[in-house]
Amino acid sequence: MTELLPDATHMGRVSLDVADLPAQTAFYRDVLLLDVLAENGPEVQLGRGGETLVTLRHRPDLPKGERRSAGLFHTAILHPDEASLAATLASVAVSTPTLYTGSGDHLVSKAFYLDDPEGNGIELYWDRPRSEWSWQSGRVVMDALYIDPQAFINDHLSDAARNHLSTDPDRRGALSGMNGTVGHVHLKVGDAELAKRFYVDLLGFELTAEWHGAVFVAAGGYHHHMAMNTWRSAGAGLRAPALGLGRVD
């Protein structure tokens, strides 16, 4: 346990400011298989198991963010098992294969990456059991090994489920009753060392890893609840109002 944060600390919802609310809603509903939980004028809440994971806010007045500015790197949606992760991944493959950007076996988790239609990064992942994680000198051991997405789908999704996802317009039935959470959020920052001081020294997160210009922090022994990198944003200053990340709860 950290000095300031309890072991039960976890991520809440992520709010995104979007230009095209109907298109973004359709993507998160029909491709990522989230349920629409509430619609209130310019705002739509989507999630799984009754829990809101993503809030979309219609903000067509905002400009598109600069690629090298600070902001969202990705929202990471944690799946309870490999079958549900494979189902979501298969839905992406059927619906929007051009938005897929890569994969990673991180030793603590298996992950697949994509962008939404407005360029907001998304990670879809499943955690290995904590008993399989390795720690060295207080830091979690992670890597970024390739995973073949089609092989993963074939290994963890039945033929019937794959057929359902490829032929049924309402693919969300493949995840009926399935839970999900925002497992972590990864940010683009201008100064990783400054971000580390803020999240660790001020907010009380534990530093769990530093890897290739990225900082990973968590509470309660998790591999990371937040990550910050400078891969595209080194030297970026305060973020100006723009489409993309609104807030993280």
Residue positions per predicted region:
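Glyoxalase I/VOC metalloenzyme domain signal
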Residues: M1-A38, R48-Y100, D115-T208, G220-D249
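Short glycine/proline-centered loop/turn elements that form peptide/ligand docking sites
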Residues: G41-P42, E193, H212-V215
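Generic recognition of long tandem-repeat/solenoid scaffolds
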Residues: Q45-G47, V215-A218
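Short hydrophobic/aromatic beta-strand element in the GNAT-like acyltransferase core
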Residues: E43, A111-Y113, G121, A214
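Short, small/polar residue-rich loop motifs at catalytic or cofactor-binding pockets
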Residues: H106-S109
